[in-house]
Amino acid sequence: IEQGKFGAHPYSDVFYRLGRLAAQEYIDADIFDDVDYLVPIPLHPRRMHERGFNQAEEICKGMSDVLHIPVDTQHLVRVRNNPHQSRSEFQRRKDNVKDLFEIRYPEEWKNKHIVLVDDVITSGATMMACMRKMTPIRGCRIGVFALGWAHK
């Protein structure tokens, strides 16, 4: 995953394929049966321009092709460009994600089941920042999916 994001030649197709593989593992389980949208953790436009792709969005696309669940990239937006989290300490991660995201048109997620998707969960601070913005939406159920987790 790290090489796909930060290597000399970042490669979006790796994340798409990993998303398909992950979805194929869960296709017979019922965990995605009532999901309305797969929502990738968004990148700031500057980081998106630098990398050329959003790895979480590529994972979502792969999952969507297998599970037939739409990908929503319009409602959850990153409004601040924070430093890379991968090598930060826990408290710094929590501080880095404050007011990092906004929900546009939250009423459209009312009574929906949303699954947030990212490549790796380390401290959970990014996912928690997104969920904090989503919890006021009436009837919105939130799930979380990541390809992996990092630990020390």
Q: What is each model feature region?
A:
Residues 40, 116-117:
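Generic enzyme active-site microenvironment
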Residues 115, 125-152:
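PRPP-dependent phosphoribosyltransferase catalytic core
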Residues 1-37, 44-65, 72-113, 123, ...:
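Active-site-facing substrate-recognition patch
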Residues 120:
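Basic, glycine-rich
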Residues 68-69, 140:
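Structural alpha-beta junctions
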